[in-house]
Swiss-Prot record:
InterPro entries: Amidohydro-rel, Metal-dep_hydrolase_composite, Metal_Hydrolase, Urease_alpha_N_dom, Urease_alpha_subunit, Urease_AS, Urease_asu, Urease_asu_c. The gene is ureC. Binds 2 nickel ions per subunit. Keywords: Cytoplasm, Hydrolase, Metal-binding, Nickel. It comes from Mesorhizobium japonicum (strain LMG 29417 / CECT 9101 / MAFF 303099) (Mesorhizobium loti (strain MAFF 303099)). Belongs to the metallo-dependent hydrolases superfamily. Urease alpha subunit family. Its main location: cytoplasm. One of its GO terms (biological process) is urea catabolic process. This is Urease subunit alpha. Carboxylation allows a single lysine to coordinate two nickel ions.
Amino acid sequence: MARISRAAYAQMYGPTVGDKVRLADTELFIEVEKDLTIHGEEVKFGGGKVIRDGMGQSQVSRAQGAVDTVITNALVVDAGAGIFKADIGLKDGRIAAIGKAGNPDTQDGVTIIIGPGTEIIAGEGKILTAGGFDAHIHFICPQQIEEALMSGITTMLGGGTGPAHGTLATTCTPGPWHMARMIQSFDAFPMNIGLSGKGNASLPAALEEMVLGGACSLKLHEDWGTTPAAIDCCLSVADDYDVQVMIHTDTLNESGFVENTVAAIKGRTIHAFHTEGAGGGHAPDIIKVCGLPNVIPSSTNPTRPYTVNTLAEHLDMLMVCHHLSPSIPEDIAFAESRIRKETIAAEDILHDIGAFSIISSDSQAMGRVGEVAIRTWQTADKMKRQRGALPQETGDNDNFRVRRYIAKYTINPAIAHGLSKDIGSIAVGKRADLVLWNPAFFGVKPDMVLVGGMIAAAPMGDPNASIPTPQPMHYRPMFGAYGKARTNSSVTFVSKAALESGLHGRLGVEKQFVAVENTRGGIGKHSMVLNDATPHVEVDPETYEVRADGELLTCEPATVLPMAQRYFLF
């Protein structure tokens, strides 16, 4: 039998079982767990390569079963499915098959048929992940959407109407008129989008109006008054209409303390935004709710991870975002009450043990929309350096930790918001919202972003050059971002009630509406993939020290991070 060295094989076809790959410049190393391609029967495109007529390409038409696109020999990194090598077949904008691609007339073991109508994306030596989902968006400016797309985000959920002061501070789109205008604008963007309506009301009628107007979730924000009455009313409407509720609790403890908020929630499922508290919430102990079985806790990325710069930048951010004045002592006291190094340090560790389930951005409102992936992996790297390997690791690799952290911005927000039937993981039947990465740039700069099976964004060189690579090389929208390809490739997520009421026709939009589902009692902390820990968390009211199941949670701030200036010269 002919043999080939591992190095030569990896160079031609990408890594296989037992090979390890470093993620960017972090200390995180993944190991290939299985390989669904067949050694000696690999398919590869190019001059003198396999995918040619009568060789790796069959005579099968699309109607007879050939797929639209194959991503060849990709290294899949997925929270649920694991870390493995495979060919990925796409059809009708969804993942049609995961396995071995080729020509069944000439090759054994083919599960994905390549035909004359099949396009090829070379995944050799590349990492493939599900598109990211940022579930904490302030829609302050439309340019955020392109910024997020170019970082590997393919779904955004949040609220707002533009740079209005309500939107600068809160992720709420108030009322059906604003809801309609925002949804109509979404036809312009190659991004899956869902809106959160304002959830602050003590009577249900106005909230029901927003859910019927297209909101796929409701947001309770302290700047609108997150009182026990508003919490109870909002959750009751959410239960009636099967939409998620996100909460930003009462930092000033004016209408009650964390215990009063928990009592008002009454055990119902809720997504707690920036649960550490720097982004807002009962001071100093909102972090305690991350141990409750009905609370899905998340972080926003400015506190990710804890560094020597974290505290200093937060005070100014907070003053701007919440319309505070540095000349008013009470405003300064409000801001300072939210920024605590002890709880931010504990947040790092709570992520590492899987007690915090989601990471999002808080775009332009104390968060950076293009850095969800970067901040997630910087946190994972910091925790490995400070805490070593996780006890769940089964080999000399970081596979479990990597799967835990990628879940935080893919499958877990998708489950929390009722979108996991369509997005969040690499699985047959789900939307082909996919991101291809060069391992050296993993989490920082994608090689290619697909939305609904079509390439929507990629780095591209001078369009007038003789080849695609000459400078200036930068991210540009691709054909999936234009015309009706854009509206046929991405969707708008709404409530089932809005979908069934005929809202799509009344608004005259082109993008398909997809209803969220299973956001209430059927899910909770136990539903969070690899991030379902429920420790008993306590906060010392004097020192702000955080303990989980009696253990003090503390760590040093990072002075140097990976995925930073090495990748961004300008």
